[in-house]
Design a protein with these regions (language model features):
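Bacterial N-terminal signal peptides that target proteins for export
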Residues: 2-13
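Short, surface-exposed coil-to-beta transition loops
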Residues: 61-63, 81-82, 152-156
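Short hydrophobic/aromatic-rich beta-strand segments that constitute the beta-sheet cores
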Residues: 47, 74-78, 93-96, 145, ...
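N-terminal leader/targeting segments and the immediate start of mature chains
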Residues: 21-62, 72
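Flexible, surface-exposed loop/linker segments and immediately adjacent secondary-structure boundaries
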Residues: 100-140
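An acidic-aromatic
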Residues: 65-114, 176-179
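Gly/Pro-enriched, hydrophobic low-complexity segments
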Residues: 125-189
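Bacterial N-terminal signal peptides
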Residues: 13-20
Length: 189
């Protein structure tokens, strides 16, 4: 009879734990990314950017600031090691390289909405170009964007959000280098 009572106790404990974890899993997956980006009209942040080559050795560390508003309007400013500023009004991209004393103005034309921030904040671009999966680790929402095109499979984007603040973006740049941007002082809208 004692074994039976003990078995019931373990079984009941197991059921309670199972219910607890199934509720926890449900709450972990309740982060609605599309709702988040729909409400993200603008943001500003400081960042540290780390660029790595194929053998994962650090090539470059950069620091700067970003101010972003929907419709491809942004100011992305690198402060260290080189002072470079990218300014987009949604139609043109102006690049100012202070060290080279050079300004380049480009029409965004068909490349509109192809910058990293637009790729992860535009629902239509996400639906068209990526398969998206999200999961939670230590209270952080990790959103993984895998390109639908087979030749782009290496260009996976990873976005980390906690407490409605973007903490990190990781991606491959045009030179097949791994880039991680860690954000601080994130302010939205």
């Amino acid at each position: 009879m004692l074994l039976s009572q003990t078995s019931k106790h373990y079984y009941l404990s197991f059921v309670v734990l199972l219910l607890f974890f199934s509720t926890a899993v449900k709450s972990k997956t309740s982060f609605d990314y599309f709702n988040y980006i729909e409400n993200l009209q603008s943001f500003s942040a400081s960042f540290s950017q780390y660029t790595y080559n194929e053998d994962d050795s650090l090539i470059k560390k950069s620091n700067g600031n970003i101010i972003y508003k929907k419709k491809s309007k942004y100011i992305l400013e690198y402060l260290k090691p080189n002072k470079i500023k990218f300014i987009s009004d949604g139609q043109f991209l102006t690049t100012y390289d202070e060290d080279l004393e050079q300004i380049i103005i480009q029409s965004l034309g068909n490349n509109q909405n192809q910058n990293i921030v637009d790729l992860i904040t535009n629902k239509n671009l996400i639906d068209k170009n990526f398969e998206m999966k999200s999961y939670t680790i230590n209270g952080e929402n990790h959103i993984k964007f895998t390109p639908k095109l087979k030749d782009s499979k290496r260009n996976i984007l990873l976005l980390v959000i906690k407490n409605n603040e973007i903490l990190k973006i990781s991606f491959m740049n045009d030179f097949e280098q791994s880039v991680t941007m860690n954000f601080s002082n994130f302010k939205k809208n």
